[in-house]
Amino acid sequence: MACLSPSQLKKFQEDGFLLLEGFFTADECVAMQQRIGEIVAEMDVPLHCRTEFSTQEDEQLQTQGKTDYFLSSGDKIRFFFEKGVFDEKGNFLVPPEKSINKIGHALHAHDPVFRSITHSPKVQALVRSLGLQMPVVVQSMYIFKQPHFGGEVSPHQDATFLYTEPLGRVLGLWIAMEDAMLENGCLWFIPGSHTRGVSRRMIRAPSDSGPGTSFLGSDPAWASNLFVPLPVRRGGLVLIHGEVVHKSEQNHSDHSRQAYTVHLMEAAGTVWSPGNWLQPTPELPFPPLYS
């Protein structure tokens, strides 16, 4: 059943995250993985777009904010790569399918397989059971977490990058395409951390000025013992509150940890910050989730 029970809703409200095991079938996961394989096989990335995507905090401005390729990807399907996968001439040092960190940020809009999954009746029923009245899809990503060098994702709150007024209007759906275990970089959360507001925001600069983005505020030094791991079997879905603190470790294993993620916003009574890096465009306004 796609709808949350009262006890599940209560747990999500208390913790800021919730695991729903077996939400998607193996066949649905296979369909998404096969489609991603086709997209990667057809990938033709110009040399100037071979941008190393880093999840290390101290490199974020350089690799994300200053790169037009990233900042203009909100309404497109684009490829972002792991560090060290190109030589100095921009040639692949590893097989191309092993080089990608993620594909973003509009699979939900431009690909029929991912559009169907994103707007599936059971996803709609799940989100309705959370009480969202007018949810819109703001972004989607396919994350690879490659074996041996799939990068660490530092502790963060999604609302740092996807800020709304009031807060509490962003919801992440994290779908495991493969088993996500301790060995290959599963998610970790600080339960209850979604009740403390947002400590930092990434702001997009005006197009005619300086670096692409900057940060306002700073994150506290979250103690490592506050985090709890959340292993997820293939097909599981994790609900993620926009302000809950979460992270993942580098993948040192022999197995990838692929996931499809979607971020939603409750549009009713909500202002999407004009300072967010991601903005709706005339070509792609944020599409309603509900049919």
Swiss-Prot record:
Binding, Fe cation: H156, D158, H246
A Gene Ontology molecular function term of the record: metal ion binding
Amino-acid positions noted as binding 2-oxoglutarate in the UniProt annotation, renumbered to this chain: K102, M141, H156, Q157, D158, W174, S248, R257
Xref: SUPFAM superfamilies: Clavaminate synthase-like
Positions of modified residues (Phosphothreonine): T55
Membrane-spanning residues: none
Keywords linked to the UniProt accession: Dioxygenase, Iron, Metal-binding, Oxidoreductase, Phosphoprotein
Source domain of life: Eukaryota
Cofactor: Fe cation
Top EC group: oxidoreductase
A Pfam entry, by short name: PhyH
E.C. number(s) listed in UniProt: 1.14.11.-
Coiled coil feature spans: none
Purpose of the protein: 2-oxoglutarate(2OG)-dependent dioxygenase that catalyzes the conversion of 2-oxoglutarate to succinate and CO(2) in an iron-dependent manner. However, does not couple 2OG turnover to the hydroxylation of acyl-coenzyme A derivatives, implying that it is not directly involved in phytanoyl coenzyme-A metabolism. Does not show detectable activity towards fatty acid CoA thioesters.
Family as reported in the entry's similarity comment: Belongs to the PhyH family. PHYHD1 subfamily.
Protein name: Phytanoyl-CoA dioxygenase domain-containing protein 1
The organism of origin for this protein: Mus musculus
